């Protein structure tokens, strides 16, 4: 019930595939658990990881990577259970070393912080799973945004675009807000303008299945203000900076 774990628990409770009464959440912080329980009275809460995992069909571990080994060794998960790890950087091979039954079905889940708004771009990798399990997990997390099943060896690159990438998008929002304020706009108005522009840009490429350059060409008239701004971005290394940031995050 930490930041990411709490967001996932809330998403599950809001969704239609799992009843609140089938959700049990563990966290050492009584305050966080009580807050979650107040929002969703139907769920169960505990400060015992073992109690939460015992008898569960699906166990979601949303703990820091350095806590994964001790937590998993304590749980002694059974082969019939499904493990979902949200710990970044912990491979399936490592997870297999931490469990009693390395043949158990495992998923690695990489959401981003927008999962709290049910708008996450969530990456999923699978090991020792069948089609039915894959489909259920994808359906489950599609209620919290968009889900993509990818090979484990693509997780690092994809994480740079999604989990890290959302911070880079917000950095652009922050910079654009500063520009708007300098030009005389109120901060709240500037933020709303930029946020809606981002939603619109995403809709253009998603709904029309077009390349960004196609949509850019539609607004860059010869001698116009947009092409002047784009050229200024490139003069200052905008594209190069984005690529370097993504590669640095891999």
Q: Which positions does each model-derived feature cover?
A:
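Hydrophobic packing residues within well-ordered alpha-helices of enzyme cores
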Residues: 8, 12, 33-36, 71-75, ...
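Small-residue helix-packing motif on alpha-helices
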Residues: 23, 33, 52, 68, ...
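Short acidic-hydrophobic, aromatic-tinged amphipathic segments that line or gate anion-handling sites
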Residues: 44-51, 148-150
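Internal alpha-helical scaffold of NAD(P)-dependent oxidoreductase catalytic cores
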Residues: 94-105, 121-158, 169-207
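Short pre-catalytic strand/loop immediately N-terminal to key active-site residues, enriched for Gly-Thr
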Residues: 106-107, 155-160, 212-217
């Amino acid at each position: 019930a930490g930041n990411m774990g709490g967001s996932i628990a809330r998403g599950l409770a809001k969704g239609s595939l799992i009843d609140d009464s089938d959700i049990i959440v563990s966290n050492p912080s009584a305050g966080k658990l009580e807050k979650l329980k107040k929002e969703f009275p139907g769920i169960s809460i505990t400060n015992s990881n073992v109690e939460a995992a015992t008898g569960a069909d699906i166990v979601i571990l949303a703990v820091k990577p350095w806590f994964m080994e001790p937590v998993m060794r304590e749980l002694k998960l059974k082969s019939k259970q499904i493990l979902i790890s949200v710990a970044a950087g912990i491979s399936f091979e490592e997870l297999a070393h931490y469990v009693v039954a390395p043949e158990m079905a495992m998923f690695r889940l990489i959401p981003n912080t927008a999962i709290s708004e049910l708008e996450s771009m969530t990456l999923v990798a699978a090991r020792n799973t069948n089609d039915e399990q894959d489909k259920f997990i994808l359906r489950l997390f599609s209620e919290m945004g968009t889900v993509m099943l990818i090979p484990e060896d693509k997780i690092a690159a994809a994480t740079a675009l999604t989990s890290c990438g959302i911070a880079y998008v917000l950095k652009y929002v922050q910079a654009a807000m500063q520009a708007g304020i300098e030009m005389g706009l109120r901060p709240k108005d500037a933020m709303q303008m930029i946020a809606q522009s981002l939603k619109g840009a995403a809709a253009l490429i998603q709904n029309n299945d077009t390349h960004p350059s196609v949509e850019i060409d539609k607004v860059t008239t010869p001698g116009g203000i947009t092409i002047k701004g784009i050229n200024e971005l490139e003069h200052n290394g905008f594209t190069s900076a984005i690529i370097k940031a993504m590669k640095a995050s891999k």
